[in-house]
Amino acid sequence: MISLPKQLVVIGDSSVYGWGDNEGGGWCERLRKDWGNNQNGPVIYQLGVRGDGIEKVSSRWEKEWSSRGETRRNKPKAILLNVGLNDTAAIGQINGRHQLDIDGFEYGLERLINEMNSQTNVFVIVLTPVDESKMPFAGCLWYSNDFCNSYERRMEEVCLNQNVPFLPTFRELYSDQRSKNWITNDGIHLNSKGHFWIFQRLKSWEILTKWKES
């Protein structure tokens, strides 16, 4: 019988898709290629959709995840979730209604992680800073670092409560002066240097490495 490699489904928004990284295709694609250097290493499925928030990911994750086991009875052994930035955006003005208010976001994330965690291993990578001087995005959406920080803290609480590994990225990036040059001109997406930084953090994330090698 042929032994299949493990599969890791990476699901989320444009960050997973790799938007902004014209050199390496994004942190997820960089990780896929890096892991692909080992013939027996896990296979990464990259399922990022631009504009997705917690509600859209919640509606599609199970079908997407379950259909990538490569054989009829097999299911991917883990999910890496990266979502939330789009939910933080205020509509119309800086103090406008959020795409999803923070309490609704926390509730939605709790449900989503609980569903995922009942079927497979779950890892969470959180948010990245924005360039507030470039707002509004698309003429109507206001992203701010205060919003990102608040939503990321809620994400951490949910992950801690459900014993799910999370990789905090916002505060580390925000405190790094170089990161101001790692955001594209639209103000919300990382450029190639930013994606490379995320890739390096994931590559050295001990708990993900242990899962990969187990």
Segments and roles (model prediction):
Residues 1-50, 54-56, 62-75, 79:
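Serine-esterase "nucleophile elbow" of acetyl-processing enzymes
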Residues 3, 40, 58-214:
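Alpha-helical cap/lid subdomain in secreted, periplasmic
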